[in-house]
């Protein structure tokens, strides 16, 4: 979120219920298919506050919050830029 001058950023990390995920397919109707870091494939919903403000594409790294009552669905809570995703890979947070 803030740049420390060394090319590194303090990135938003997953909170209690969130997991890293990679977008694998665009489904339409504000939904995407994601492969989560916990090994699950989920259908994720893009909430209204993100629509038309934050564009999500295939292969983007996002944070999702799985639903409590239906484990194969989730909500997208954050999208990382490409440089941020590269930093997460370098630091070992994602593969």
Curated annotation (Swiss-Prot):
Domain S1-like: 7-81
GO terms under cellular component: cytoplasm
Assigned keywords, A-Z: Initiation factor, Protein biosynthesis
Keyword flag Iron-sulfur: no
UniProt-listed Pfam families: eIF-1a
SUPFAM superfamilies noted in UniProt: Nucleic acid-binding proteins
An MF annotation (GO) of this entry: RNA binding
Keyword Protein biosynthesis: yes
GO biological process entries: translational initiation
Family note: Belongs to the eIF-1A family.
Function as written in the Swiss-Prot or TrEMBL entry: Seems to be required for maximal rate of protein biosynthesis. Enhances ribosome dissociation into subunits and stabilizes the binding of the initiator Met-tRNA(I) to 40 S ribosomal subunits.
PANTHER family: EIF-1A (PTHR21668)
Protein's name in the database: Translation initiation factor 1A 1
Organism: Halobacterium salinarum (strain ATCC 700922 / JCM 11081 / NRC-1)
